[in-house]
């Protein structure tokens, strides 16, 4: 049986709910969902593996005033969540996380022998992944990197540049070439990250197998035709073009609901004043967004397909959209395999006029046709991209490492 230590910032659902509700600056939740789905996928393979986490507590001085953080381990879905205590101050936090995580990873690797043990590291969490990687090198334990973004192309988190970003990017880049295997979002990533041709797996995303039980019924749809965008609200992500295109649509029954953080937050009041059909909800809990998606007519991802970073990303929102059973309209992103194309509507013209035309055509379709199209997308991702299926593929990768 494989024993897996999952190193990231992942929290149990109850711990995350507490951190989210007490945060003065609400964090994006997509990376938490990505990691939790994979870990829960491992936990569903009880006969072949056992998984526990080693997690940096995802707090910053900007999000929480509390300085000393020491959280007890907790259990959820047969997963033990272990948290690294720290002091929530610049530099001090990262140093403490590195030191404590290093010794915890050493102890985990040596306790009971190294046989059949493997460590998975989220390389974008530099302090804790660097500590775990060093521990693995010293104990000769295999370490696999999970790469959800490339440091020098990140739009999230460290957007404003400066010394902090440069240090983060250099450390991440220096470390990411030293793993024994890689879990990547796109094939293009492999050319950049896997310079030593180690075993790797392309896993562009995953969906919650439990969504099979979530009913998406025509009778439960909102009486208005709601279009939802949930994600980072950045002009570079195509959000401004989406809004401009929507404002050209005619129909008082149409709505555009926007969820998420980003640089365009400050512009939202102006857009809502110009067009009362537009509503901005900020950052809300993921389960609330999922419920709203079930009631919507269309889910959209306007991210530009010509930006360099799109070669190395597959937005988790596309997977979340598809498993909801509500149809999705997206740009033809380079990182999206062709197998997805029959199950999504495409913005083939990525101008404001092109977005407007595509939205107009889709929203004119009968609701039954939209519902059937969304249902086929849901069945596709549940069959081929569920967290149980993807976790099994990762377990197969471990045999090659």
What residues fall within each predicted segment?
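Conserved donor-binding/catalytic core segment of Leloir-type glycosyltransferases
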Residues: 5-7, 218-237, 242-246, 257
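Donor nucleotide-sugar binding/catalytic pocket of nucleotide-sugar-dependent glycosyltransferases
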Residues: 34, 144, 152, 169-215
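Nucleotide-activated donor-binding/catalytic signature segment of Leloir-type glycosyltransferases, i.e.
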Residues: 266-293, 298
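Acidic donor-binding loop of glycosyltransferase active sites
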Residues: 293-311, 326
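Conserved acidic donor-binding segment of nucleotide-sugar-dependent glycosyltransferases
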Residues: 342-353, 361-367
């Amino acid at each position: 049986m494989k024993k897996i230590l999952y190193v990231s910032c992942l929290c149990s659902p109850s711990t995350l709910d507490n951190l989210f509700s007490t945060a003065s600056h609400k964090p994006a939740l997509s990376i938490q969902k990505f990691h939790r789905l994979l870990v829960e996928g491992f936990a569903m393979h009880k006969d072949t593996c056992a998984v526990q986490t080693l997690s940096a507590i995802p707090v910053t001085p900007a999000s929480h005033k509390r300085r000393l953080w020491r959280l007890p381990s907790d259990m959820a879905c047969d997963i033990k969540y272990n948290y690294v205590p720290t002091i929530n101050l610049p530099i001090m936090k990262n140093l403490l996380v590195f030191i404590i995580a290093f010794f915890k990873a050493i102890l985990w690797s040596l306790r009971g022998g190294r046989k059949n043990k493997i460590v998975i590291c989220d390389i974008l969490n530099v302090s804790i992944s660097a500590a775990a990687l060093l521990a693995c090198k010293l104990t000769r334990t295999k370490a696999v990197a999970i790469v959800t973004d490339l440091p020098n192309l990140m739009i999230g988190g460290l957007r404003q540049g400066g010394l902090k970003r440069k240090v983060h990017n250099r450390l991440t880049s220096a470390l990411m070439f030293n793993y024994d295997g890689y879990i990547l979002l796109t094939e293009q990533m492999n050319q950049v990250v896997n310079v030593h041709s180690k075993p790797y797996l392309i896993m562009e995303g995953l969906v919650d197998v439990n969504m099979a039980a979530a009913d998406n019924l025509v009778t439960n749809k909102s009486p208005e035709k709601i279009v939802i965008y949930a994600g980072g609200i950045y002009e570079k992500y195509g959000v401004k073009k989406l809004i401009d295109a929507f404002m050209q649509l005619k129909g008082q029954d149409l709505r555009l609901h926007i969820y998420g953080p980003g640089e365009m937050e400050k512009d939202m009041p102006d857009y809502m004043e110009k067009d009362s059909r537009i509503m901005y909800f900020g950052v809300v809990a993921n389960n609330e967004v999922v419920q709203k998606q079930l009631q919507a007519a269309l889910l959209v991802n306007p991210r530009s397909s010509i930006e360099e970073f799109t070669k190395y990303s597959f937005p988790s929102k596309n997977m979340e959209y598809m498993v909801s059973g509500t149809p999705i309209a997206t740009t033809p992103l380079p990182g999206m395999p062709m197998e997805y194309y029959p199950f999504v509507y495409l913005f083939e013209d990525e101008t404001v006029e092109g977005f407007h035309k595509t939205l107009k055509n889709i929203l004119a379709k009968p609701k039954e046709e939209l519902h059937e199209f969304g249902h086929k997308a849901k069945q596709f991702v549940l069959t081929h991209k569920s967290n149980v299926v993807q976790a099994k593929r990762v377990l197969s990768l471990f045999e090659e490492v």
